[in-house]
Structure formats: structure tokens, C-alpha cells
Amino acid sequence: MKLYWQEKYPQAFCWSFGDSPALADELAALVVAGKKRGTCSSLVSYQKEQPPVTPGSYHIVLNDTGDAVCVIRTLALRLIRFNEMSADLAALEGEGDLSLAYWQAAHRAFFEREGNWSPEMELVYEEFAVLEIAP
């Protein structure tokens, strides 16, 4: 499936969500189930991506074993500070109980592991649409 999608979307990036195999599977499952339509990264991490993600970009989402689970397309990007995250954008990420409090706790832990967390840190928030799901 990954090879098929790489041929169909030759400019697509292949990657997995999160920073662990368990998180990669959990978040990919939320995307496939239609619950996750947004994600964010620290601006520091975003600036290291080559080429950078832009609206219209295609992505092949992988699970923890590197198998392709779906193709998504970036619809919009916005710059937002961690402490300015809205409840609506937090819920769009589809994680936990969908609350802003859950989002703050989970993402603070993630960004602390990354070594970039502060309440004022800048995030790149991405909204995306699912185009195809693996059978």
C-alpha cells in the first residue's frame, strides 16, 4: 500500500505521529476513525522539516511498523502559542476526552520529552483531511 500511494502521491511525505510506537498506532487509529483532523508541532521542530509542510501537502501516515494506514492532505497551517490553544482546536486533535485540559497535559508531556516546552512556546497547528484509508 505504501508503495502504491508513493506512486500515486509522489511528493507525499511518509511519517508517523507521536514519538513512540504506541503513540504512532494510537494517533493513526484516531485519524482512520475520523476523530483526529488536526495536529501540532513545535515551531522549532517544524523549522527542521525538509521540505517544510505547506497547505496542499500530501502525507502518507505510517503505523509503528512502517505500514501505510492512510493518506492525508494539509488544509491549513497556523502559528499559535501553547498557552493560547483553544478548546476547539484541541478537540480537533481527537485525543483523550477532547478537552483543552487533556490536550494541555498530553502535549506538555510530549514537548517536555522533545526538550522544547514552555507556556509561551510557538506551535505550528495543522488541519488536514483524510483522502484514502488502507483496506
Residue ranges and their predicted role:
Residues 1-71, 77-135:
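Mixed-charge, low-complexity intrinsically disordered regions
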